[in-house]
């Protein structure tokens, strides 16, 4: 897994092309899928020791096909969750082509990875959109590609294939660590994904009238995973 913890936290674009699901055990279409999702300032390598111990268990080894989701962990959580959803759709289609007889998924998330896992069991729509924008998405003056990025981040369905989620030290109510002064300094140098930077700039320049006060605050300040892990984060 070609992720380096700190650089992947700070420099999204350098690692963006490596984001996605990686199969870490042999393909077995008749098995259930278990997906491991690492946390902030981490990488798929964090699961190495756990996987070695897991593979030693014959019952678990025979039941599950293992995958891991790798991602640059400094980007905003909704953006990363949208990418995980896309990766899950691609994985399900791939396994179906290979003759998968079932598509039951277990997600295991550590730290922020647990928040991404939880997002796969949730639904979102107009109620969440209206917290940020005061016009419908189709009336927003942005390019069609940027509109789809927004749609994927805010309008989504849960995955019926996800039958179980295991949380490992997950900050469901935020983390005080993300609010300390040192982390705030780190947050200031986290690189925003280029797609999001362009989208935010376009909204501020052409559609600022469409933003709610909360939306305007987010658009002007920007938001990354460290900001969103603060207990006071909206």
Model-derived regions: residue spans:
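Intrinsically disordered, low-complexity boundary segments flanking structured domains
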Residues: 53-57, 152-154, 227-230
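Flexible, membrane-associating and regulatory peripheral segments of lipid-active enzymes
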Residues: 1-36, 43-49, 65-69, 90-100
